[in-house]
Design a protein with these regions (language model features):
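NAD(P)-dependent short-chain dehydrogenase/reductase
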Residues: 57, 87-140, 144-153, 157
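Conserved Rossmann-fold NAD(P)-dependent oxidoreductase catalytic core, especially the SDR/UDP-sugar
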Residues: 6, 22, 26-74
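Active-site segment of SDR-like NAD(P)-dependent oxidoreductases
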Residues: 10-12, 49-56, 102-105
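Conserved catalytic Lys-bearing alpha helix of Rossmann-like short-chain dehydrogenase/reductases
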Residues: 25-31, 78-86, 121
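Mid/C-terminal beta-alpha module of Rossmann-like enzyme folds, strongest
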Residues: 150-215
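Short-chain dehydrogenase/reductase
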Residues: 21-22, 71-80, 115, 137-141
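NAD(P)H-binding glycine-rich loop region in Rossmannoid oxidoreductase-like domains
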Residues: 1-26
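Conserved catalytic-core motifs of eukaryotic protein kinase domains, centered on the activation segment
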Residues: 14-20, 54-58, 110
Length: 216
């Protein structure tokens, strides 16, 4: 083994840090230890752009050490801890690289991960026949196959030691999506939409708490 690419994660934006720590933090520690055994191995840690806390002026060189993360958002907090561990290992000579992903969508052929929050939101709106008219979200998507190819390319070029943002600045507004389907969907206020989806949460993949956190 020459290279370890650590993309395994438990992605749950509603779970607290302690719930996600065994999978997202302890596993990272174990893989970093693996990279020091017998011979040094390159370690590529797949993180999230959200560790920057939406800082507008942040870039790959931004020091995230002082950025606070609420333990209630366990996913982002666990990725922040993972980055700190990866940087610490780099300090001790392990060739590490950090890849921060934005919102990764389907591949170019349309296959998508059904548990992703955006897919759940769109599915829920379609299932209910209603969308939220007084709240909107700007979304920037990257294709999963393009993202994977970029990571593989960086890993094979032996560019250890860097931090890379694998995301796009091109955004679209969710309201633009809904406008194309207004004849089939009813516009509701956030309160009305949440009340209706709560009644249907068994068939809308338990998205209520996630969307509440996202839009409120």
């Amino acid at each position: 083994i020459d290279t370890v690419i650590h993309n395994a994660t438990h992605m749950n934006h509603s779970a607290p840090y302690q719930f996600l720590k065994p999978t997202n933090v302890d596993a990272t520690q174990a893989l970093l230890e693996l990279c020091t055994q017998q011979k040094l191995k390159q370690f590529h840690f797949i993180s999230t752009i959200d560790v920057l806390n939406n800082a507008c002026s942040a870039d790959e060189a931004t020091d995230i050490f002082a950025l606070a993360h609420d333990p209630s958002n366990g996913y982002v907090a666990s990725k922040w801890v993972g980055e700190m561990m990866t940087l610490n290992a780099r300090h001790f000579g392990v060739p590490t690289t950090i890849h921060r992903l934005g919102l990764v969508s389907s591949d170019k052929y349309g296959y998508f991960e059904p548990n992703q929050w955006l897919i759940k939101l769109l599915y829920s709106c379609q299932h209910m026949g209603a969308y939220i008219q007084d709240h909107s979200v700007d979304v920037a998507l990257t294709y999963v196959d393009e993202t994977a190819n970029t990571i593989a390319g960086l890993a094979t070029r032996n560019l250890a030691g860097g931090t890379y943002h694998l995301c796009t600045s091109k955004q679209f507004n969710m309201m633009d999506v809904f406008k194309h389907h207004t004849s089939q969907m009813t516009p509701l206020s956030l309160e009305q939409w949440l009340a209706q989806i709560t009644q249907n949460d068994d068939t809308t993949n338990g998205i209520t708490s996630l969307i509440t956190d996202l839009l409120q």
